[in-house]
Amino acid sequence: MAERTNIYYWKCDREDAFHGTSDYQKDQSAFLTVVRKTLEERFGGALTDVVSSCGQGNHRTFEAVLDGQKVFIRTEDGMEKDNYLAVESAVTNRVAALGIPVPETMAFDCSRKQGFAWQVLPFLPYRDLNAYVKDGTIVWTGIAEQIGTGVARWQEISVDGFGPFCTAEAMATGGLRTLHPNYESYYRLNLAKHVRFLVDGEFLSERDACRIMKVIGAHERFLNLARGVLVHKDLAVWNILGTESEVKSFIDWDDCIVGDPMDDLSLMGVTGEDSVTRKIVAAYGRVRDLEGDAGTRFWLCWLRNILFKAVIRQGAGYFKKSSDEFFLIGGGRNGADLAAVTRQKIEKALGALEKGGGFDAL
């Protein structure tokens, strides 16, 4: 069983980097047979109608009926034998206890008796918000308020230390324990490696790389956090289910960490429009303080997040996609457009930090 001690972000730092970021879910008939057998052994005749789902994330996903209820099944079959599904289940139980809408974990098993970990969740009959963004029907007023408030409220969960949680602890006790003693060590983890990857792939220039490291170095005092908060770490419209005007569930917590209170807010900026991010930040600010150095830390989080996302997008070939069918690519656009937006997001963070790092740069 692997811990995430050397992982800043799983999808790009894992040993089998970019596993599950391609089209590997398209033909999984053989794996479906194994999943069906494994779950039938666990649930017997209570489980029926197991079929492949159509997820675009890094888990193979399925749908089924359990005790007459439609359910959603996520599996993790990577070579690292990562069991972070146990952490996710422990975290979402705590988030749900705050009254925040998240999927309830009905059952999970990280024993890997059949070579994979699995998790059973209720099937939620809602589209992700990205679908409404793409077809132009989303109503941001109420949704932005719910997102900002949701982030502020799940930050009530605070654990000593920083970074990813210890999988062994979650599996043994259901408890939460982090893997890094301070925030700066987590923030800088694999940073140079990520920047070098982007330079070697000709996404960034050597000059860009020097500028990035210089800007971060000039602001390193803001990485000295006394205590962190729960961070979703993959917060985006495709990880929120709902209607055109209402959030129904914050999903996919399998990258959650303890980090900076500004992290999840910055992620909404990295993956969305500035006008929407301003609304989300304002909603957050009605619940939690945004004074002091919050603006600078927001842009530091933004920069670190767009860098790891650029690594994933380049490494997984997203910049080469020719249509908007992939969830990351906006309607009517392609991979080249995604590359251009990614560069713009990097430049935005660098420019904001070089000019003082306030929220007015949004």
Predicted regions located by residue number:
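Juxta-kinase regulatory segment immediately upstream of eukaryotic protein kinase catalytic domains
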Residues: A2-G44
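An alpha-helical support segment within catalytic cores of ATP-dependent transferases
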Residues: D27-A46, V139-E145, E156-K233, D289, ...
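Short, surface-exposed alpha-helical segments at coil->helix boundaries
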Residues: S29-T33, L85, S89, R278
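ATP-binding pocket architecture of kinase catalytic cores
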Residues: V51-R177
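Active-site acidic catalytic loop and adjacent metal/ATP-binding pocket
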Residues: R60-V65, I73, A117, R211-D263
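Generic structural signal for small/hydrophobic residues in well-ordered secondary structure
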Residues: T61, I73, T92, T105, ...
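Glycine-rich, phosphate-binding/catalytic loops in enzymes
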Residues: A90, T137-I138, M171, S249, ...
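Helix-rich C-terminal or lid/interface subdomains of diverse kinases
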Residues: T141, E145, N224-R227, L267-L362
